[in-house]
């Protein structure tokens, strides 16, 4: 997670 995505723990 770069900038707190909708899915916690995912890279978007």
From Swiss-Prot:
Entry-annotated residues carrying Phenylalanine amide: 12
Keywords of the record: Amidation, Neuropeptide, Secreted
GO cellular-component term (any): extracellular region
Localization (cell): Secreted
GO BP annotation list: neuropeptide signaling pathway
Similarity-based family: Belongs to the FARP (FMRFamide related peptide) family.
Annotated protein name in UniProt: SIFamide-related peptide
Organism: Delia radicum (Cabbage root fly)
